[in-house]
Amino acid sequence: MKIIIATHNPHKTEEIKNFFKGYPVEIYSMADLGIKEDIEETGNTIEENALIKARFLKEKVDGIVIADDTGLFVEHLNGQPGVYSARFAGENATYEDNNKKLLKLLEGVPYEKRKAYFKTVIAVVEREKETLLEGKLEGHILDHPRGKNGFGYDPVFYVDNLEKSLAELTMEEKNKISHRADALMKLKNYILKRLEEK
């Protein structure tokens, strides 16, 4: 089975390939197929963005297309950065820029009011069918970055029951508990079901 991921992000591609190791599934990114176009994420929600990306790519390729979008939702900030998580500090913001802006906005806010959750939505687009799968991880925002692993908001997102930030976890540890892992687990079950149907 051929799955194409609507992303230019090598981290995401690697993560998804790891998840499907040992399964009869071939996974390609847009880069693998030489598709260089940027897909404009014009949706008002992460669900809309995931579907926009998957539908765009499905018009160009055969196979099952998946696209995801992730947002960090901070309670104290009324759900910000949300759909703007990747460009929270501006259009060409780095991970570090986004983290700095978030920490600045939460300066002086006590720990119990720094509740946040990550949500990943995966859109699966096939010939006649569109499916949305969702994963979630709850935690708190730290007052300074911790850890060297991962990417994005991982250094400032604290997983309470592990007493570590996401950036302090190994890829294996993160893959067991993250919002992406939760959504990818649902994707894996979905794909395995599709393999059984063949």
From Swiss-Prot:
Signal peptide positions (record): none
Residue sites binding substrate per the record: T7, H8, N9, P10, H11, K12, T70, F151, G152, Y153, D154, K174, H179, R180
Cofactor: how and how many bound: Binds 1 Mg(2+) ion per subunit.
Cited InterPro entries: dITP/XTP_pyrophosphatase, ITPase-like_fam, RdgB/HAM1
Keywords per UniProt: Hydrolase, Magnesium, Metal-binding, Nucleotide metabolism, Nucleotide-binding
Cofactor(s) listed in the protein's UniProt record: Mg(2+)
Top-level taxonomic group: Bacteria
Family indicated by similarity: Belongs to the HAM1 NTPase family.
Quaternary organization: Homodimer.
Protein known as: dITP/XTP pyrophosphatase
Taxonomic source organism: Thermoanaerobacter pseudethanolicus (strain ATCC 33223 / 39E)
